[in-house]
Amino acid sequence: MPKATRGVLIECDPSIKALIVNIDSSQHNIILDELDDTHLMIHPSMVEVVKQKLNKMLAENTYNPNEEAAKATGK
């Protein structure tokens, strides 16, 4: 008999999907199913957690020239 699972469909770029898979690799309770290269089904209660962790990861990997200028001047 088929089993139904409630989830949230996420459509994203393959690079963002890789980040979400990386987040899930440490917890194993986020991704319910990997549908294809750009779609994931994730647990409904984990949507906000994924958003927060993605924002943090993307902020860490974003170049900000103002921060570089502040470091150079010692501020």
UniProtKB/Swiss-Prot annotation:
GO terms for biological process: nucleotide-excision repair, preincision complex assembly; transcription by RNA polymerase II; transcription initiation at RNA polymerase II promoter. Pfam families: Tfb5. Gene3D superfamilies: TFB5-like (3.30.70.1220). The keyword Transcription applies. Signal peptide: none annotated. It is found in: Nucleus. InterPro entries: TFB5-like_sf, TFIIH_TTDA/Tfb5. GO terms for cellular component: cytosol; transcription factor TFIIH core complex; transcription factor TFIIH holo complex. Keywords: DNA damage, DNA repair, Nucleus, Transcription, Transcription regulation. Its main location: nucleus. Belongs to the TFB5 family. Component of the 7-subunit TFIIH core complex composed of XPB/SSL2, XPD/RAD3, SSL1, TFB1, TFB2, TFB4 and TFB5, which is active in NER. The core complex associates with the 3-subunit CTD-kinase module TFIIK composed of CCL1, KIN28 and TFB3 to form the 10-subunit holoenzyme (holo-TFIIH) active in transcription. Component of the general transcription and DNA repair factor IIH (TFIIH) core complex, which is involved in general and transcription-coupled nucleotide excision repair (NER) of damaged DNA and, when complexed to TFIIK, in RNA transcription by RNA polymerase II. In NER, TFIIH acts by opening DNA around the lesion to allow the excision of the damaged oligonucleotide and its replacement by a new DNA fragment. In transcription, TFIIH has an essential role in transcription initiation. PANTHER family: GENERAL TRANSCRIPTION FACTOR IIH SUBUNIT 5. This is General transcription and DNA repair factor IIH subunit TFB5.
